[in-house]
Amino acid sequence: MRIERVSTDQFKIFLTFDDLIERGFTREDLWHDASNVRSLFSDMMYEASSELGIELEGMLLVQVHLMQAQGMHIFVTQQYEDNSEDEDYIEMKVTLDESKELIFSFMDFEDIISVTSYLDPMGLENIRLYYMEDRYYMILDHIELSRVDKEDIIGVMSEYANPSIVTSHRIEEYGKLIMEENTVQQIKRFFY
């Protein structure tokens, strides 16, 4: 679990699926076991409070973004209100959002060339390739993922790349688009 302060009233937590397993959760538990999820969030808020040296009080707005292969991004914003009735009460509003895409980052273009030989038989066509901050990013959208087994893709990609915690919105805004469509075929044509 990684905790990072964003501003004086906001911080973010990145929790991998391995972190969830260590805490006794599966991905499905997040959708079906509300009481244990509340307990998990309470524990995470306590850890964040201790690590960042902040006192959590009042209302907390919690946004949870589930990333297909990566884990969860949790954004917590503390709203300060004049709530003199019960200062020890913490209210959390939770928003769950599951990402419908897979994003992988590569350190070296050679790894992208290598992985395309495994992606080609899967028939993947709509993979976007970006370059940003000395890394390459492959984004597979939800339409592409509905045609093949996600676990197969994750297995192949994890041999050559790392799951990205950078969102597609940030990559699209700040990254340089290298290939927008037929990425696998283009790489095969130019490098094989």
Swiss-Prot record:
Q: Which InterPro entries match?
A: MecA_C_sf, Neg-reg_MecA
> Which ranges form a coiled coil?
none
According to its UniProt entry, the protein's GO biological process terms are: establishment of competence for transformation; negative regulation of establishment of competence for transformation; negative regulation of sporulation resulting in formation of a cellular spore
Q: What sections of the protein cross the membrane?
A: none
* A GO term for molecular function: protein-macromolecule adaptor activity
Arranged from A to Z, the UniProt key words for this protein are: Competence
| Residues in the signal sequence | none
Q: What does this protein do?
A: Enables the recognition and targeting of unfolded and aggregated proteins to the ClpC protease or to other proteins involved in proteolysis. Acts negatively in the development of competence by binding ComK and recruiting it to the ClpCP protease. When overexpressed, inhibits sporulation. Also involved in Spx degradation by ClpC.
HAMAP family registered for this protein in UniProt: MecA
Please quote what the entry notes about the protein's domains: The N-terminal domain has binding sites for ComK and probably for unfolded/aggregated proteins; the C-terminal domain interacts with ClpC.
Q: To which protein family does this belong? A: Belongs to the MecA family.
Q: How does it assemble?
A: Homodimer.
Q: What is this protein called?
A: Adapter protein MecA
